[in-house]
Amino acid sequence: MEGSSSAIARKTWELENNILPVEPTDSASDSIFHYDDASQAKIQQEKPWASDPNYFKRVHISALALLKMVVHARSGGTIEIMGLMQGKTEGDTIIVMDAFALPVEGTETRVNAQSDAYEYMVEYSQTSKLAGRLENVVGWYHSHPGYGCWLSGIDVSTQMLNQQYQEPFLAVVIDPTRTVSAGKVEIGAFRTYPEGHKISDDHVSEYQTIPLNKIEDFGVHCKQYYSLDITYFKSSLDSHLLDLLWNKYWVNTLSSSPLLGNGDYVAGQISDLAEKLEQAESQLANSRYGGIAPAGHQRRKEDEPQLAKITRDSAKITVEQVHGLMSQVIKDILFNSARQSKKSADDSSDPEPMITS
């Protein structure tokens, strides 16, 4: 029973995050893990990304690396964490095959790597090569607990510095709080543009919910980087390691509830939504009664998408709560209905008491 429940939980996680096995599903599929030193050196010499800021368009992440990053991010709670990713490049795709955590000091809004973290980084990379893992560091990951996957001003500066000296380099952001609330991994992969690079004003990034106290930081820097498409894969080499990791953590999938574990996060979302509504109402009132008519008309047109975004945020909160309730109902039916049915059957099989006049 335990083995089947573990397998079902892991299969559900793989389906929700669209983790696909490498085809064909035999030892030949593990060729993706083969590191060709000559081809990687050739790419480093050619540097195709130097002439095209949007050269890299896709990220291919192994299921093992994804699970390690999510577990690490979740272990930090409301404190930001940081780690590095190892892999290689293949055309316009960055392939992430493994990840490791860094000993860093984090807060609820930023994470800082000190000298001991850099020493650990160098030592880990050297030891990996001695163990036969020739992949280089291809990026860094960190968490944004509860406020979405995007790059802050500090993140943009860090990524620009890394791209200047360690190309090819990738930035991945994971939101562990929204991951628990939504039921699938909330993740984003980004690369920054060179300093001074201009993009068109009609460039629109995918909409996501940003807390009111983070909107300014998001808006100032949102045109300094672009996002990459993320896909996941697993091979026969991953299967055993995934089993070992999953056997340790799968019980949490069934025993935890986003409604209980994320209560503070949901309360914060509702409070943030109320502040956004008050702000929109204030701006709408000013546009109606303040200034001359054309200016007021222009501001009113700008308010419409803001209200639409607030509606989206409200719908997102509602859907996540409904999903949480549905999962609780399903678990109740799965684990309690059989016990209740057995109890009812036992009660009906008891002999009826004799009635004497």
From Swiss-Prot:
Q: Binding positions for Zn(2+)?
A: H142, H144, D155
* Tissues where the protein occurs: Ubiquitously expressed. Highly expressed in flowers and roots. Expressed at lower level in seedlings and siliques.
Q: Where is this region: Disordered?
A: 338-357
Q: Which gene encodes it?
A: CSN5A
Q: What is its EC number?
A: 3.4.-.-
Protein name in UniProt: COP9 signalosome complex subunit 5a
UniProt-reported outcome of changing C149A:
No effect on CSN complex integrity and no effect on CUL1 derubylation
Q: Would you name any one GO CC term?
A: COP9 signalosome
Q: What is the required cofactor set for this protein?
A: a divalent metal cation
Q: Which UniProt keywords apply?
A: Acetylation, Cytoplasm, Developmental protein, Hydrolase, Metal-binding, Metalloprotease, Nucleus, Phytochrome signaling pathway, Protease, Signalosome, Zinc
Effect on the protein upon substituting H144A: No effect on CSN complex integrity but impaired CUL1 derubylation
Q: What is known of its domains?
A: The JAMM motif is essential for the protease activity of the CSN complex resulting in deneddylation of cullins. It constitutes the catalytic center of the complex.
Q: Which molecular function term from Gene Ontology is one that the record holds?
A: metallopeptidase activity
Q: What family is reported?
A: Belongs to the peptidase M67A family. CSN5 subfamily.
State the protein's purpose: Probable protease subunit of the COP9 signalosome complex (CSN), a complex involved in various cellular and developmental processes such as photomorphogenesis and auxin and jasmonate responses. The CSN complex is an essential regulator of the ubiquitin (Ubl) conjugation pathway by mediating the deneddylation of the cullin subunits of the SCF-type E3 ligase complexes, leading to decrease the Ubl ligase activity of SCF. In the complex, it probably acts as the catalytic center that mediates the cleavage of Nedd8 from cullins.
Keyword hit for Disulfide bond: no
Looking at the UniProt entry, the stretches that span the membrane are none
Knockout mutant characteristics: Short hypocotyl and open cotyledons in dark-grown seedling, accumulation of anthocyanin and expression of light-induced genes in the dark resulting from an impaired cullin deneddylation. Severe developmental defects resulting in dwarf stature and loss of apical dominance. Csn5a and csn5b double mutants are lethal at the seedling stage.
The Gene Ontology biological process annotation of the record reads: COP9 signalosome assembly; negative regulation of photomorphogenesis; positive regulation of G2/M transition of mitotic cell cycle; protein deneddylation; proteolysis; red, far-red light phototransduction; regulation of defense response; response to auxin
The keyword Cell wall biogenesis/degradation belongs to this UniProt entry's keyword annotation: no
Where can the motif JAMM motif be found? 142-155
Q: Where is the MPN domain?
A: 59-196
Subcellular localization, as worded in the UniProt entry = Cytoplasm; Nucleus
Residues the record lists as N-acetylmethionine modifications? M1
**Subunit arrangement?**
Component of the CSN complex, probably composed of CSN1, CSN2, CSN3, CSN4, CSN5 (CSN5A or CSN5B), CSN6 (CSN6A or CSN6B), CSN7 and CSN8. CSN5A or CSN5B are present within distinct CSN complexes each containing only one copy of CSN5. Interacts with itself. In the complex, it is located in the center and probably interacts directly with CSN4 and CSN6A or CSN6B. Present also in subcomplex forms which inculdes CSN3. Also exists as monomeric form. Interacts with CYT1 in vitro, but not in planta.
Gene3D superfamilies in the record: Cytidine Deaminase, domain 2
